[in-house]
């Protein structure tokens, strides 16, 4: 029987990643099928899977680097969060990355008693309670305009349930899972588009998978898969919201190297260009996600803030027609002069004029 320590140590984090990746891999099509918010592009399950895959790969790289020795827990937890950050896909994946980053900020910090700590707050279960609370609060802060009935609501319910539970880490994780699952069933009544479609929130559904995996890593008993999907109905094509009516045409995602001040200005700029704005990260590295009509303007805003790279642009209309098939790609050219920009534009590329790097 595998070891099931009542502590989120390095081995448990590795197991958590593995179990979560397996669960999302099994459920990704089901989650894709109920994806109707914020855009019905049928990719939430896939985006969550790819985000967790990047996190898992980062964790495995740490274990490889340590060779036959067991890695430091802090190194593994930070790697998980960093891997999710650089590999985050879509709105849901970006929020998941911030949830993991919030947890890592607590779980990877030195465990020292501080003035004002409540009894047990620095033990393993207490740290997990604080980590789940930090995860939820940091995710809300990352979203420009938080909406209830989404994975944010589910994350908060998980943190609330964990905070109200005594016992070890496994018991706290189980309470968080139960709280998240209960909150998930309430999402159709909180968000009208979910109620009309008769589904729960897709991002929240994926988060329940991730929390179920956490339970499995700490207790050795992962909650039954059939219980996680209770109340979900597949959206028929003739009932799905029209992707092309209302809302921006493009999803733009990129990694950005920039300082805190520049990112604060970028948030304001992007908030005026579109919606579904989520900016996650810190310490000079960020993942930027936004839905806009002018993809070039969103990228140019990133160039003004710092150094954007790994730029991805998805046209929602194309995603609707080719759901769960190969995503169409766009070409973005960063060019030094207007003449070259004109040539690239005529060839069908989105062009951005290069600017000197910011010094503040």
Where are these regions (language model features)?
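N-terminal loops that bind phosphate or other acidic moieties
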Residues: 1-360
């Amino acid at each position: 029987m595998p070891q099931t320590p009542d502590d989120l140590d390095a081995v448990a984090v590795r197991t958590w990643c593995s179990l979560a990746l397996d669960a999302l891999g099994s459920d990704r099509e089901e989650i894709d099928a109920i994806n109707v918010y914020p855009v019905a592009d049928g990719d939430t399950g896939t985006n969550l899977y790819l985000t967790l895959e990047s996190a898992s790969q980062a964790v495995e790289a740490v274990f490889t680097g340590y060779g036959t020795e067991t890695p430091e827990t802090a190194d593994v937890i930070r790697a998980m969060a960093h891997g999710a950050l650089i590999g985050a896909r879509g709105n849901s994946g970006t929020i998941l990355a911030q949830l993991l980053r919030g947890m890592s900020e607590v779980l990877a910090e030195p465990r020292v008693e501080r003035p004002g700590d409540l009894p047990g707050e620095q033990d393993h279960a207490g740290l997990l309670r604080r980590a789940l609370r930090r995860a939820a609060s940091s995710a809300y802060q990352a979203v420009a305009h938080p909406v209830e009935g989404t994975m944010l609501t589910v994350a908060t319910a998980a943190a609330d349930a964990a905070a109200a539970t005594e016992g070890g880490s496994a018991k706290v994780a189980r309470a968080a899972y139960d709280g998240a699952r209960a909150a998930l069933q309430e999402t159709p009544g909180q968000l009208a588009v979910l109620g009309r479609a008769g589904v729960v929130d897709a991002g929240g559904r994926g988060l329940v998978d991730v929390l179920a995996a956490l339970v499995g890593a700490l207790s050795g008993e992962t909650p039954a898969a059939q219980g996680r999907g209770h109340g979900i109905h597949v959206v028929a094509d003739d009932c799905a919201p029209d992707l092309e009516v209302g809302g921006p045409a493009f999803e733009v995602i990129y990694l950005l190297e920039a300082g805190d001040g520049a990112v604060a200005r970028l948030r304001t700029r992007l908030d005026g260009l579109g919606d579904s704005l989520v900016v996650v990260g810190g310490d000079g590295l960020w993942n930027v996600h936004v839905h806009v009509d002018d993809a070039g303007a969103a990228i140019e805003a990133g160039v003004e803030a710092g150094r954007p790279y790994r730029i991805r642009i998805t046209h929602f209309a194309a995603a609707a027609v080719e759901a769960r098939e190969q995503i169409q790609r766009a070409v973005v050219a960063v060019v030094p002069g207007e003449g070259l920009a004109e040539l690239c534009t005529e060839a069908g590329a989105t062009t951005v004029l290069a600017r000197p790097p910011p010094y503040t």
